[in-house]
């Protein structure tokens, strides 16, 4: 796998991990401040995932994705 594709793959994994962490944090949070924190984490993960998926798809269309 090309280094740029590997970086995109890792970014997708990071976004998935961020979503898992946001879910875990929401389950154990004790105040609204934590709710805001984990909400921002979740929103950021969705934005990051969307960007990384778009870039992965662009690489696939160009025939770069292995």
Predicted segments, located by residue:
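Short, charged, low-complexity loops and linkers
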Residues: 1-5
């Amino acid at each position: 796998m090309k280094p740029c594709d590997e970086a995109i793959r890792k970014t997708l994994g990071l976004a998935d991990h961020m979503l898992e962490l946001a879910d875990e944090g929401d389950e154990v949070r004790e105040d609204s401040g934590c709710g805001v924190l984990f909400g921002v984490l979740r929103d950021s993960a969705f934005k990051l995932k969307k960007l990384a998926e778009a870039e992965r798809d662009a690489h696939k269309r160009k025939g770069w994705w292995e």
